[in-house]
Amino acid sequence: MRITIKRWGNSAGMVIPNIVMKELNLQPGQSVEAQVSNNQLILTPISRRYSLDELLAQCDMNAAELSEQDVWGKSTPAGDEIW
């Protein structure tokens, strides 16, 4: 895929096609890390850091609290561990 670099004031920029934005799950305004390696420009999305308030807002504070025995006693293997 070819993308043209265009003059943007004293800088230069390029437009990332929407299909690429969707494939990489990028949003307008999101930051990326830029690095040059072997004469290539590599852009890596920077993961969003959530605040404690944002994380707690996603919790169901009325959910029943399970005892440790319930959690461990009824668990199933998640990988290659042996039970």
Curated annotation (Swiss-Prot):
It holds the Pfam family MazE_antitoxin. Antitoxin component of a type II toxin-antitoxin (TA) system. May be involved in the regulation of cell growth. It acts as a suppressor of the endoribonuclease (inhibitory function) of ChpB protein. Both ChpS and ChpB probably bind to the promoter region of the chpS-chpB operon to autoregulate their synthesis. SMART domains: SpoVT_AbrB. Gene3D superfamilies: 2.10.260.10. Induction: Part of the chpS-chpB operon. Interacts with ChpB, inhibiting its endoribonuclease activity. Keywords: DNA-binding, Repressor, Toxin-antitoxin system, Transcription, Transcription regulation. Belongs to the PemI family. The lineage of its organism: Bacteria, Pseudomonadati, Pseudomonadota, Gammaproteobacteria, Enterobacterales. SUPFAM superfamilies: AbrB/MazE/MraZ-like (SSF89447). Residues 3-48 form the SpoVT-AbrB domain. InterPro entries: Antitox_PemI-like (IPR039052), SpoVT-AbrB_dom (IPR007159), SpoVT-AbrB_sf (IPR037914). One of its GO terms (biological process) is regulation of DNA-templated transcription. GO terms for cellular component: toxin-antitoxin complex. Disruption phenotype: No visible phenotype. One of its GO terms (molecular function) is DNA binding. PANTHER family: ANTITOXIN CHPS-RELATED. Signal peptide: none annotated. Transmembrane segments: none annotated. The keyword Transmembrane does not apply. This is Antitoxin ChpS.
